[in-house]
């Protein structure tokens, strides 16, 4: 892999990669943040006994929809950029086969545009103006990932003969009766025109994975002995680690070039606005630098139940609650106490809300009851304590589960056993 990634020619490859499972101990440090996530269908047999028991008790059922999973198993027909491939090979993964190679001309055609948007966002005086420039930049990236194969033709039909002709067509999908004399007929387009630069969008997505992986494997793991991943998203990541004061300050100084310290207090020793609103740098999740050990505000409490469902609380009692799929009107009812009950008592939080829906272009008001918070997570192999997890599809997952001793609980009691003892 001596081909340079800085030339005018770029490469996207479809490869088969082996995670070198014969030396699983070497990749134990990868388990918290595995390389090369992929979309796969998770079967019930892939889940841990703890998750399966929780499914039976709550009556929950799995869906056959593919989920984005980060695991240590081998990858087949995986598509990635050459720079990303070089990175994973440098960290011990093995290249088994190259299935296809796409060569293209690469230039920084959006560099000036992005730099101008970043400058305008930095100069913004209001939050709405700042968010506006962010949306302008994100919308450009979203158009690059537009899938032309998902387009649908919709025709408004009033005649019976015309409607019958469209329904009998091979391209017919479905129809909606709006009134006795008006029907909407949906059909597949007869031809697909690929007019969006999907290669640019795919390259940006692949390089964003590379930025996250580089930060964890090249910076965090080299500065801290055992960093534990708390949560991660497309543009955010949070690790938990315990270090001595001297080691913490040394690591903080060595990693200062990847952070944006503009949200810290002006009197803080690390405060700087040189990287304010610049892409590619990490900033504090909480105001005034929660990542700084001696700052006035830092993260003091964290609860996480499943993907994109977590709660942060700081020393100054400020909270950040993330709850994907939960309506905003019900999100205010979630807090540290509800997350604590869901994790330690396996309780299910439900809520009722009203919404306006349209059926056949007629507005109705519905009263819905939704499950807001639960411990069910189908993206990780949850161990018997219910508080620790490992990646899915591991050959030694059952052995790890049997020998596991939870560091957050006394002895080998699970969270559910502790709750039963309290009730007794």
Listing of model-derived features with the role each one plays in the protein:
Residues 1-424:
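Conserved acidic
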């Amino acid at each position: 892999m001596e081909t340079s990634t800085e030339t005018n020619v770029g490469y996207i490859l479809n490869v088969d990669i082996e995670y070198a499972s014969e030396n699983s101990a070497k990749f134990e440090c990868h388990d918290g943040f595995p390389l090369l996530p992929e979309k796969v269908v998770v079967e019930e047999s892939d889940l841990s006994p703890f998750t399966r028991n929780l499914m039976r008790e709550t009556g929950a059922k799995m869906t056959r929809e593919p989920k984005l999973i980060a695991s240590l198993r081998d990858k087949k027909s995986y598509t990635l950029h050459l720079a990303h491939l070089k990175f994973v090979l440098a960290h011990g993964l093995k290249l088994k086969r190259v299935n296809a190679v796409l060569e293209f001309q690469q230039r920084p055609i959006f560099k000036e545009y992005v730099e101008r948007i970043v400058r305008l966002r930095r100069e913004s005086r209001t939050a709405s103006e700042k968010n506006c420039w962010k949306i302008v930049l994100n919308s450009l990236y979203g158009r690059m990932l537009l899938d032309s194969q998902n387009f649908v033709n919709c025709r408004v039909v009033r005649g019976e003969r015309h409607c019958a002709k469209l329904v009998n067509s091979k391209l017919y999908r479905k129809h909606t009766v709006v009134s006795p004399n008006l029907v909407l007929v949906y059909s597949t387009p007869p031809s697909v025109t690929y007019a969006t630069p999907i290669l640019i969008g795919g390259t940006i997505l692949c390089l964003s994975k590379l930025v996250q992986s580089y930060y964890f494997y090249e910076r965090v793991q080299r500065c801290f002995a055992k960093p534990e991943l708390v949560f991660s998203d497309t543009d955010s990541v949070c690790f938990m680690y315990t270090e001595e004061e001297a080691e913490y300050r040394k690591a903080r100084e060595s990693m200062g070039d990847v952070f944006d310290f503009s949200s810290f207090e002006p009197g803080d020793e690390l405060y700087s606005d040189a990287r304010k609103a610049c892409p590619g740098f990490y900033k504090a999740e909480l105001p005034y630098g929660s990542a700084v050990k001696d700052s006035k505000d830092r993260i003091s409490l964290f609860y996480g139940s499943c993907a994109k469902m977590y709660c942060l609380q700081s020393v100054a009692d400020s909270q950040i609650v993330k709850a994907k799929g939960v309506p905003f009107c019900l999100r205010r009812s979630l807090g540290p106490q509800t997350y604590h009950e869901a994790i330690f008592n396996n309780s299910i939080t439900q809520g009722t809300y009203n919404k306006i829906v349209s059926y056949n272009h007629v507005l109705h008001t519905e009263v819905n009851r939704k499950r807001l918070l639960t411990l069910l997570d189908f993206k990780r192999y949850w161990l018997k304590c219910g508080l620790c997890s490992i990646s899915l599809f591991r050959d030694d997952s059952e052995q790890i589960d049997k020998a596991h001793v939870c560091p957050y609980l006394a002895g080998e009691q699970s969270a559910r056993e502790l709750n039963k003892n309290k009730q007794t």
